Amino acid sequence: MTHSTLRIRQARHTDAAALEQLASLDSSHAPAGDVLIAEVGDELWAALSLDDGHAVADPLRPSADAVLMLGAHGRQLRREERRRAHGRPRLRFA
């Protein structure tokens, strides 16, 4: 039995056709804007738009956990972006 690793990464423009195909499998439209994808090996299992939260997943694969992981990773990325934008919080002493 082989074990494959789920990998999360930012979508690239070269992923457009695969995102459209995944959305078609999920009877939906492809996520737009900043998109994270979850892939196992060379197969795209799920994708999530960081802009509006729209997700698609391969219904023929056990992809529910992949969608949850994309959401958690996306929230972490957004928190880090907000921290960088606002600088480090300062400690205040009473």
Where are these regions (language model features)?
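N-terminal low-complexity, charged segments
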Residues: S24-V35, A55-P62
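Amphipathic alpha-helical "stalk" segments
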Residues: T2, V40, R90-F93
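Charged, low-complexity, helix-prone segments enriched in Lys/Glu/Asp/Gln
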Residues: D26-P31, E39, H73-R79
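Short amphipathic alpha-helix that is part of the acyltransferase structural core
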Residues: M1-H29, R84
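Soluble, non-transmembrane catalytic domains of enzymes that act on hydrophobic metabolites at membranes
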Residues: T14-A17, E43-A46, D51-D52
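Conserved beta-hairpin
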Residues: D34-A46
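Acyl-donor binding region in acyl/amide transferases
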Residues: L50-A94
